[in-house]
From Swiss-Prot:
It comes from Conus betulinus (Beech cone). This is Neuropeptide Y2-like conopeptide. The keyword Secreted applies. Causes hyperactivity such as jumping, rapid circling and tail flicking, after intraventicular injection into mouse brain. Belongs to the NPY family. SMART domains: PAH. It comes from the Eukaryota.
Length: 37
């Protein structure tokens, strides 16, 4: 089963928080976007 995308905080309190979210999102799309053979 595919996990849900990371939850987006309503407000990013720091640059690190934003970067972590973007990194998790990229990881999520890398997993989800992988072709199924």
């Amino acid at each position: 089963t595919v996990s849900d995308p990371p939850a987006r905080p309503a407000v990013f309190h720091s640059r690190e928080e934003l970067m972590n979210y973007v990194r998790e999102l990229n990881l999520y799309f890398a997993i989800v976007g992988r072709p199924r053979y």
